[in-house]
Design a protein with these regions (language model features):
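Histidine-acidic metal/acid-base catalytic patches
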Residues: 1-9, 13-30, 158-180, 184-269
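Active-site-proximal loop/turn and secondary-structure-junction residues that shape catalytic pockets
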Residues: 9-11, 38-40, 66-67, 111-113, ...
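Active-site acidic/histidine proton-transfer and metal-coordination neighborhood
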Residues: 17, 77-177
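Conserved beta-strand positions in the central sheet of alpha/beta enzyme cores
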Residues: 35, 62, 106-107, 146, ...
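Short, basic/glycine-rich phosphate-binding loops at helix/coil junctions
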Residues: 69-73, 105-111, 206-207
Length: 269
């Protein structure tokens, strides 16, 4: 296993030196890579970000895709064909981006909510057909889409690991794999460690996020037990730390999470 940390879209920073400072802090703390939240690949300054990553010898482990659900209403479950097509083309542009970076894209929030499509069966069918199209495109581009089960308060479809596994296996595309997020597992799963059984062949990415979205250790997620379970199933990919609800400065969060990971016995594979 390797460790990464989730940073916001570089365009949201007040200047590049602040972004570079976050990367330097991550490097000093001991993280191996970065994951970025990106709103629009067409506005992503790839050359500048690449220079920033080269300074700390980092790879880009993943791009998150879901922010435009809130900002633009992009989703795949809706009966509105125009919105679906816009979202599909956005995801294809993420596939292009990931292909250039030899990275993955994280997909979950752009499924949409039941308020976008109250008929769960119809919405799920639209999501499936859209991801089949994007997944086939990703095969051509040698890129991977990691399908994330998101809790029912944020997404209306495929909320549990079992539902996501069924979705991924049903598509049967080498470009569509599974990822899991500890925050969503805590909400949706009866036994938070047991759902990892029999998914090792499709598990491609992991998000580490505390139960209250604060720094690791501030909630009640069993981090040590989770790492032991990942080791049991042979997971060797990235674990990306995400902190989304805190009063701490970012550098303090980066350091605090690494301290908790070390305390819990994280070992690189």
């Amino acid at each position: 296993m390797k460790l990464s940390y989730v940073l916001p879209d570089p365009s949201s920073y007040r200047d590049w030196s602040t972004f570079d400072g976050d990367l330097a802090c991550m490097k000093q703390a001991g993280y191996d890579a970065v994951e970025l939240q990106i709103a629009d690949p067409s506005r992503f300054d790839e050359d500048r970000v690449r220079r920033s990553l080269e300074r700390v010898s980092y790879t880009m482990c993943a791009f998150q895709t879901g922010s435009t659900y809130a900002s633009r209403g992009n989703c795949l479950c809706t009966a509105d064909e125009g919105v679906r097509r816009r979202t599909i083309e956005l995801l294809k542009s993420f596939v292009d981006l990931a292909s250039r970076w030899k990275s993955i894209i994280v997909f979950g929030s752009l499924q949409g909510r039941l308020s976008d499509e109250p008929d769960r069966q119809a919405g799920s069918a639209r999501i499936r057909e859209a991801i089949r199209e994007v997944g086939r495109y990703a095969v051509e581009k040698n890129a991977t889409i990691d399908f994330e089960p998101v809790n029912h308060g944020e997404v209306g479809f495929h909320n549990t690991i079992a539902e996501a596994v069924e979705f991924v296996r049903g598509l049967n595309l080498p470009s569509v794999r599974l990822m899991i997020d500890t925050f969503h597992i805590n909400i949706e799963e009866r036994e938070v460690l047991s759902p990892l059984t029999d998914i090792q062949d499709i598990l491609a990415h992991v998000h580490l996020s505390e139960t209250n979205r604060d720094v690791l250790g501030a909630g009640h997620w069993p981090t040590a037990g989770f790492f032991a379970r990942l080791a049991e199933v042979g997971y060797a990919g990235h674990c990306s730390v995400g902190v989304y609800n805190t009063r701490k400065p970012r550098h303090a969060c980066i350091d605090a999470c690494m301290q908790e990971l070390t305390r819990c016995g994280f070992k690189r594979a």
